[in-house]
Regions:
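Bacterial N-terminal signal peptides that target proteins for export
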Residues: 1-7
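Short, flexible loop/turn motifs enriched in small residues
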Residues: 6, 42-48, 245-249
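Generic marker of residues within folded, mature protein domains
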Residues: 13, 40, 62, 89-91, ...
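C-terminal segment of classical bacterial N-terminal signal peptides
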Residues: 13-20
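Compositionally biased, proline/threonine/alanine/serine-rich low-complexity intrinsically disordered stretches
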Residues: 23-44, 328, 380, 384-391, ...
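Active-site-adjacent loops and short helices of periplasmic peptidoglycan-processing enzymes
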Residues: 24-194, 198-203
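Domain-terminus/edge residues, biased toward the C-terminal soluble/receptor-binding domains
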Residues: 170-174, 182-187, 191-399
């Protein structure tokens, strides 16, 4: 991993950290991408698909292969929970609504070797218990019961998951089940997982508080939340772990410090201990080494563009949205900006029409481009102005 990110990771715990119970009970196979790396026991764990996001603005602070689709394992249960949260907000269900535990949900969830909440066949379970099972202990049986109860079948529920992903602009996402169990077509990028987590924080506070619960008891069984950040990183309050043989050990984590939220996503580690170590050190680095810089607020004018044959000679260029750039603190100190457009612009121009870009660049920063829109409607010139412009062009080009 890049030196800037792992500077904090070299200060490791002196003694071995006790692993928490994890979902899978099969021996773990090393992720394919890590198989060719030399074994260096003293080195810090090297996760794959790393995203560090500023949770307030959504700016990506650090990206390592963060846009590549990856197998998310149980981290995709964030979307499962979101679909349930949407139904609650729309008053289609309540927390007291009860769903039937079918043989399919029992056999493929409660009787599987993955995480489950010990649901009993043919029992009736409240959505309150089911959603806690999904969020706190990653229960596969609860996922299937919720999918069948809400949509009639897991496949119909998956269609809702994929439709919601499209609505949220999660372009890398494609889901094939409600649980995250292995499937080569069940993928999402770490950057899109971070965006999904940020959406949950902002729009489903009633569910989000469950992600910080340390344990859940159902049917006489108490299970602990596997999130290694809870209780170890100041301000940590979510979200979700994941593990399969194909994905390795991954984490979507979030924490708030000094009023600022950071969201962390990574995958591909070889053990729970590695996930714990990487999660703690990366989240600390997220607050200590990274920052954001606001370039402009939505609607702020950043320049003007020349207009050809318009009712006025220039168009005001304003920010379409808030413009925030994130990255290592040292990099942000050297930012440069400039406006680019293909001009002069040709009238008529609608107010809010994208007509230019603000380019942000600097040493060590990948160039970023943000849309600028016309702050005014600009009509076409009248016939006299057009005729005069025609004469001007004709005679200026005659010599």
């Amino acid at each position: 991993m890049k030196t800037a990110v792992w500077a904090a990771c070299l200060l490791l715990l002196a003694s071995a950290l006790p692993p928490a119970a994890d979902a899978a009970r099969r021996p773990h196979r090393v992720a394919r991408h890590a198989a060719h790396q030399p074994v260096q026991p003293a080195a810090a764990p090297q996760p794959l698909h790393v995203t560090i996001m500023d949770g307030d603005s959504g700016a990506i602070l650090h990206c390592e292969d963060c846009n590549a689709p990856m197998p998310p394992a149980s981290m995709s249960k964030l979307m499962t929970a979101l679909i349930v949260g949407d139904a609650l907000l729309q008053h289609r269900i309540t927390l007291d609504t009860r769903y039937h535990v079918s043989e399919n949900a029992w056999r493929h969830g409660a009787m599987s070797d993955g995480s489950h909440m010990f649901l009993e066949l043919n029992s009736e379970v409240s959505i309150r218990d089911l959603i806690q099972g999904v969020i706190v202990v990653s229960a596969n049986d609860a996922c299937i019961v919720l999918a069948e109860g809400l949509a009639g079948s897991e496949s119909a529920f998956v269609a809702l998951m994929n439709r919601r992903a499209q609505e949220l602009g999660l372009r890398s996402a494609h889901f094939t089940n409600a649980t995250g169990l292995p499937d080569p077509n069940h993928v999402i990028s770490s950057a899109d997982l971070a965006r999904l987590a940020r959406y949950l924080v902002a729009n489903h506070p009633e569910l989000y508080r469950l992600y910080g619960e340390r344990a859940f008891t159902y049917n006489g069984h108490t299970q602990e939340n596997r999130n290694p950040l809870l209780g170890t990183v100041a301000g940590a309050d979510g979200l979700k772990t994941g593990h399969t043989d194909d994905s390795g050990f991954g984490l979507v984590g979030s924490a708030v410090q000094n009023g600022h939220r950071r969201i962390l996503v990574f995958n591909g580690l070889r053990s729970m201990a590695d996930r714990r170590e990487a999660g703690i050190n990366l989240m600390r680095a997220a607050f200590e080494q990274y920052a954001t810089q606001r370039i402009a607020r939505r609607g702020q004018q950043l320049g003007e563009a020349q207009v050809y044959l318009g009712s006025r000679a220039t168009a005001p260029l304003v920010a379409q949205n808030d413009i925030v750039v994130g990255g290592p603190q040292a990099v942000l100190a050297g930012l440069r900006t400039h406006v680019v457009y293909a001009g002069p612009l040709r009238a008529p121009i609608a107010q809010g029409q994208v007509v230019a870009q603000l380019v942000v660049e600097g040493p060590g920063l990948q160039t970023k481009r943000f849309p600028l829109v016309s702050g005014q409607r600009i009509g076409g010139a009248n016939w006299f102005a057009k005729a005069w412009e025609g004469l001007r062009v004709t005679f200026s080009g005659a010599h």
